[in-house]
């Protein structure tokens, strides 16, 4: 008789328990076909997480194949824990972005903290030392108490984990819109550095080689976390707090250092983080990639409490754990290393030649599954999509009250300074951060060299909602411009696709069209996709989030001396690069004045993006530019205001645009500040003004004049979010 009391195979079938785990009738039937029998409780649990949307990408896989994944600098693309890109001198940059949306909606502190911990382990599992963290966040409007609570918890969780483990958080972006009420997006990105010959893979091969577990003891936290992340949020989601993992950054730090030492051992065969789906995904994926079988003896798994069943062990998402495959006979060398770092570890199995994934507990078999079908035969769904109907009524911007709109947009949390939030993050630990949060890209020195890695993270929603294909191109181009703005050469990107339910025709079409646009932009801008993540079913009470693809991009600065002059001063000249048109679809002014965003906008010219980018990058490298800012949310006027407030400098500019166009969000534009006595050599550049010493922000056009004291401007910009967050609940 089994030591554990669990539903029988017959119970699972008759009571349709598989549906509670997220499997359909058809998927259950497919499992039965693969096994040649009805699955037991542990087996159906394993299939349910491996075939969940979060792990299998069953609705998005056809679209992901569009992305270019190879290129001049790519050493390792999708399929491993993170992408690896060459930066010269036998070094590479390793990076990836992941979502932790559903857990953060239920338990914001732990949801965000474990999102940070998980992405760090992805980078470490490749063998890289993390050098910085980034994040992309979305919340509902801060007028709502619930959204303020979520924001506080998420920011505290990000800072709490990153600060404790000793990795600086150097860049990010946050936007606010009521479409994210109760359904925040928390996307975390990590960047690391590695030597070429130290790159590791998550593979299990070599018959007889041993499987070693290391890290926190397994508990019952996070069981079915992958399944939870693959369903819509509902009023019952609060009851799923046990599906949210608990992070321990102090153990995370020990595990990181131990892992980075373990990768120097020649006897290491493969290594993988135990992330989504825990021991199930790490072990079965390693076996599949190695073309091997595995036998795990689950009584050897370190557990936090007695009585944890094989089902619970395999589906637990206890944090701070790694799985290694090491050469037979060298186990003690690794166990001694982990003992030195005060980590629990154990040999829990071995590689076999059976091509079967076998789990036993004290010789009782709890699972016997063919490896390849579990990993490779998850269902893939190609559905029918429908383009949404848009409101074709043309909004009138002919009588815009410039003064009122300017003050309101400057203080909207999406545009306002985020200093109140990012000051909770340690930005300098490691002492290699050159450009800190507040600008569009971070710059971190590659230790011991004159090189630096520039990194940025950028998401787009309203444009993607308005026109998914063009919006997909825009989000890639925005990240590209952010790297150009610090003089970096963009190398490659990672993506996180945040959408609602793909089973709804309009959302499925948004996913299809936006990924097509992203793929096209990647090709033209030479930024292949080397890693990524998909997060679907981001819906609450039948309301879907905006489709929100997020792009993390890295670039190389081959000589950090380029940035020595990067600080504007009085007498410098202002240029705008790129034309301004009537582009209000999806803009901040459209949302402010009309309460909705559903109008078309002009298409983006990707070939122009490349030409402008090369000219601006050259200006930075030649010491001509003292600051570069992409024109983003709120348009030209708000971009100039942010520069003035950020540097506490007066600006005087005259713009050849209408009042409404002051707030237009035409793509492909930059503000370039050029050193006094220099000029900008760029076909698309127009001189518009100067940096002044009178502490006045003054912008004029044919119709209006906006004048603000810089201190007052800064007080409004810096004070907006603190004022929202200290509102009486």
Swiss-Prot record:
SUPFAM superfamilies: PurM C-terminal domain-like, PurM N-terminal domain-like. One of its GO terms (molecular function) is magnesium ion binding. Coiled coil: none annotated. Mg(2+) 2 binds at residues 122, 273. Pathway: Purine metabolism; IMP biosynthesis via de novo pathway; 5-amino-1-(5-phospho-D-ribosyl)imidazole from N(2)-formyl-N(1)-(5-phospho-D-ribosyl)glycinamide: step 1/2. The keyword Secreted does not apply. The keyword Magnesium applies. Keywords: ATP-binding, Cytoplasm, Ligase, Magnesium, Metal-binding, Nucleotide-binding, Purine biosynthesis. It catalyses: N(2)-formyl-N(1)-(5-phospho-beta-D-ribosyl)glycinamide + L-glutamine + ATP + H2O = 2-formamido-N(1)-(5-O-phospho-beta-D-ribosyl)acetamidine + L-glutamate + ADP + phosphate + H(+). It comes from the Bacteria. One of its GO terms (biological process) is 'de novo' IMP biosynthetic process. Belongs to the FGAMS family. NCBIfam families: FGAM_synth_II, PRK01213.1. Part of the phosphoribosylformylglycinamidine synthase complex involved in the purines biosynthetic pathway. Catalyzes the ATP-dependent conversion of formylglycinamide ribonucleotide (FGAR) and glutamine to yield formylglycinamidine ribonucleotide (FGAM) and glutamate. The FGAM synthase complex is composed of three subunits. PurQ produces an ammonia molecule by converting glutamine to glutamate. PurL transfers the ammonia molecule to FGAR to form FGAM in an ATP-dependent manner. Monomer. Part of the FGAM synthase complex composed of 1 PurL, 1 PurQ and 2 PurS subunits. This is Phosphoribosylformylglycinamidine synthase subunit PurL. It comes from Staphylococcus saprophyticus subsp. saprophyticus (strain ATCC 15305 / DSM 20229 / NCIMB 8711 / NCTC 7292 / S-41). The gene is purL.
